[in-house]
Amino acid sequence: MTDAAAVIERVRQRVDPTPAERRALAAAASRLTERAEAAIAELPVAADVVQVGSTARGTWVAGDRDIDLFVRFPSDLPREQLETYGTTVGAAVLPDGHEEYAEHPYVTGTFEGYAVDLVPCYDVAAATEIKSAVDRTPFHTTYLQEHLDDGLAADVRLCKQFLKGIGVYGSDLRTQGFSGYLCELLVVEYGGFEAMLAAIEDWQPPVVIDPAAHQQASFDDPLVVVDPTDPERNVAAVVSAANVATVQHHARRFRATPSEDAFTPASPAPLDAAALRSHIDRRDTTPLAVVLDAPDVVADQLYPQLYRSRDGVVRGLREHGFDVVRAAAWADERAVVFVELASAELPAVERHVGPPVSVGTHAERFYETYADDDGVYGPFVDDDGRYVVERDRDVRTAGGFARTELGTVALGARIESRVASGDYDVYVGDAVVEALLPEFESELAAYVDPKA
């Protein structure tokens, strides 16, 4: 047995559900289905129940306790009635559950220790005819039930655990990683987990995988996996370029040096105030934090706005002459844009380079603009033959920028409204430590010890 095979066998023992787990889940799903069918029988419309997701396809990892049931209603049913009937069935099946809202309401709750979602959808003839995003999910289950055998399903579990171990599992907009469905499609496409790693090692983004050979739509993403049930959809659309590269890095490392560590999420060492101060002192950089109460929106709406705000702040700082080492954005009860700077203060003057003297009218206009300005040094000609002036900076400190200039940079909508009202705080240097700990201890611990 090779080193890789030995490691994989040990991981299989961790991720494969036991026969008892399988029987218990199947029994619970059966009882839930019976409840749903009984509730449907009381409705004035026909509908059926299908189990979807990893537990329906046999690709769930040991310890997962999720059951997803979809109630399919006629495609001509008005949306309002679909929502009403769907939540009626959900309440009957999960009397202690509660409603949540995606594209339309569904009921979530617990049953015999399992987390259960009961979701109404339309019974359409094909995924290309969907009336709501969830309508395509049953087609995913059908497709994979036709293409997965027990061996491939077991390899999907390995794939999921591998991606969890390296921190890129999850299609939420915070993680920007790989969904369970994407894992399944990749394992099917390449014929197994090890073959998938070998293929990933050789990826040259943009990577395009078209399982059903649709060859219809084009996508502008680093990884494209065309949904075999819907040629207009890229299953990997949410996966960031950084996470594509991270998977490649770990695929290469595992194939070179197999280790169970690849399947185990890293746990950063605890970080207290003294350790954070020591890290900052050792790097001789200056941290800056813009902190505000987290907007009351779901994570998939919040994080794109946070990431846009982070990028806008970084771009604004750089445009004002600051050297940004690295930046991040986090949210809990509060939201944070965190920026590490080479220096938090700049010289009183900045160099403003104009056009080459040789370009005539444009150069003359630059010269005349500053020729009689007593507030600048110059204009003079530099060694490259360009006009240059040295002028006073509008903003000399990073803290000053964050307090007065945030309204000029691109921010997420909810962040922008808080900034416009002045409802945010700015911390620079040592003040960041007390402001962010202990609320953001895990995020800061990962930040100070970055790993691919």
From Swiss-Prot:
Binding-site residues for CTP, renumbered to this chain:
54, 57, 140, 160, 169
Q: Name one GO biological process term.
A: tRNA 3'-terminal CCA addition
Necessary cofactors: Mg(2+)
Which GO molecular function terms does the record list? Answer: ATP binding; CCA tRNA nucleotidyltransferase activity; magnesium ion binding; tRNA binding
Q: What class of enzyme is it?
A: transferase
Q: Which domain of life is it from?
A: Archaea
Q: Does the keyword ATP-binding apply?
A: yes
Q: Which residues cross the membrane?
A: none
Amino-acid positions noted as binding ATP in the UniProt annotation, renumbered to this chain? 54, 57, 140, 160, 169
| The UniProt record lists the keyword tRNA processing | yes
Which keywords accompany this UniProt record? ATP-binding, Magnesium, Metal-binding, Nucleotide-binding, Nucleotidyltransferase, RNA repair, RNA-binding, Transferase, tRNA processing
Instruction: Write the Enzyme Commission number(s) for this entry.
Output: 2.7.7.72
Coiled-coil regions listed: none
| Catalytic function, reaction form | a tRNA precursor + 2 CTP + ATP = a tRNA with a 3' CCA end + 3 diphosphate; a tRNA with a 3' CCA end + 2 CTP + ATP = a tRNA with a 3' CCACCA end + 3 diphosphate
Q: Name one Pfam family in it.
A: NTP_transf_2
At which positions is Mg(2+) bound? 66, 68, 117
The subunit field of the Swiss-Prot or TrEMBL record says:
Homodimer.
Q: Would you identify the family this protein belongs to, as annotated?
A: Belongs to the tRNA nucleotidyltransferase/poly(A) polymerase family. Archaeal CCA-adding enzyme subfamily.
What biological function has been recorded for the protein in this entry?
Catalyzes the addition and repair of the essential 3'-terminal CCA sequence in tRNAs without using a nucleic acid template. Adds these three nucleotides in the order of C, C, and A to the tRNA nucleotide-73, using CTP and ATP as substrates and producing inorganic pyrophosphate. tRNA 3'-terminal CCA addition is required both for tRNA processing and repair. Also involved in tRNA surveillance by mediating tandem CCA addition to generate a CCACCA at the 3' terminus of unstable tRNAs. While stable tRNAs receive only 3'-terminal CCA, unstable tRNAs are marked with CCACCA and rapidly degraded.
Q: What else is known?
A: A single active site specifically recognizes both ATP and CTP and is responsible for their addition.
Q: What is this protein called?
A: CCA-adding enzyme
Q: Which organism is it from?
A: Halobacterium salinarum (strain ATCC 700922 / JCM 11081 / NRC-1)
Gene that this sequence comes from: cca
